[in-house]
Amino acid sequence: MKDIFNENVSLKTETPAFAKHVLPAVPSSEVYLEDCVKALKRFNDNHFDLAIVDPPYDFSIGNKTNFYVSQGKYNKVQETRPKGGFKIGGNYMDSIEKAPNEEYFKELFRVSKNQIVWGGNYFTKHLPPSTCWITWDKMNGENYFGDCELAWTSFGSAIRKVKKVVHEKGRIHPTQKPIYLYDWILQQYAKPNDLILDTHLGSGSSRIAAYKGGFNFVGFEIDQEYYEKQEKRFNDFK
């Protein structure tokens, strides 16, 4: 056998077919069971390229037993417990998580270069004016929830509208958004090699979309039940 390291040996100049295409590295996907505000303090300024977040915004019903909030076609929100609490999409809750305060938004803007905030119309006191909002047409029909959801963005482009195109099965979180919505957001607003942040991971749709798109991702979820559910959902997807 010839010594291929001998300088007198001429190697073939043609590269084998399998070596012509360099396979992309598998994107990292790190999620933590942790309070996001405390966690963000560990990161340097502008550590993340794009934050896509869906914070809660103080929705509760009170203690009216068996009270139907929605009198429409689907009755998506219904009182279910004698001391209060309600159901959304099959999930029983006492109330939706408390809305984030000024400290949260201060840290969010510090650690990320650009931001997309779902429910931005509820947080106008924390967000600067923007010309670029995203409107997601959920095509809900007759029920308590709005026909659309709005997302504030830090970008300077025009308002964009996304229509519901598919109904995803396997709902694991009451405010779960579909993967295709995050697919679209990443295609429109993220750049190659961007590091994506989600402070309220919930169902993990953003995580799956980032993995599909080849983006490195960091997410936080404070609720252990939802953390475990999204972890299973992500691993099942992989």
Question: Model segments located where?
Answer:
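Conserved glycine-rich SAM-binding loop
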Residues: 202
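Class I S-adenosyl-L-methionine-dependent methyltransferase catalytic core
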Residues: 1-197, 205-238
